[in-house]
Amino acid sequence: MEGEGLLVRKIRSGVVIDHIPPGRAFTMLKALGLLPPRGYRWRIAVVINAESSKLGRKDILKIEGYKPRQRDLEVLGIIAPGATFNVIEDYKVVEKVKLKLPEESQGVLRCPNPTCITRKEREKAVSKMVLVSQDPPAYRCVYCGTTVMGDEIHDLISP
């Protein structure tokens, strides 16, 4: 295609997240705690609604200098299962992971039930959710049985 090329330059080190469903890039940045003011520590490129042969449209994130944590893969898998998470070092991809919904999530998703033991300040119970459906995505709290589905899940990600 004429005029096709890089929208954003390559990064020396950090992460590139590709094949994000359109409209979810900022949800990912928020969940990672990378929106301002904390986000000013890294150079972040956000591409919204780019053309994609696989998805039709997609979002892309490039975060230069960011060192991913294991929790990040779990959080991002909840937001955008199927997206590709690339770790970059010296301009090369050194690790590539296809994000997926975690089978179990401990301390990442908050139970929305106000009477759940994990919501009580006096209790030390950490939230624990198990995947009960891939499509649509759904998680169930192991303590109270509350089930959450779809985009509602994104609102329950703990900071």
Swiss-Prot record:
Domain of life of the organism encoding this protein: Archaea
One GO MF term: metal ion binding
Pfam families in the record: PyrI, PyrI_C
GO cellular component: aspartate carbamoyltransferase complex
Biological process annotations from GO: 'de novo' pyrimidine nucleobase biosynthetic process; pyrimidine nucleotide biosynthetic process
Ligand binding (Zn(2+)): C111, C116, C141, C144
Binding note for cofactor: Binds 1 zinc ion per subunit.
Keyword Zinc tagged: yes
Keywords: Metal-binding, Pyrimidine biosynthesis, Zinc
Cofactor(s) demanded: Zn(2+)
Similarity comment: Belongs to the PyrI family.
Assembly and interaction partners: Contains catalytic and regulatory chains.
Protein task: Involved in allosteric regulation of aspartate carbamoyltransferase.
Name recorded for this polypeptide: Aspartate carbamoyltransferase regulatory chain
Name of the gene encoding the protein in the UniProt record: pyrI
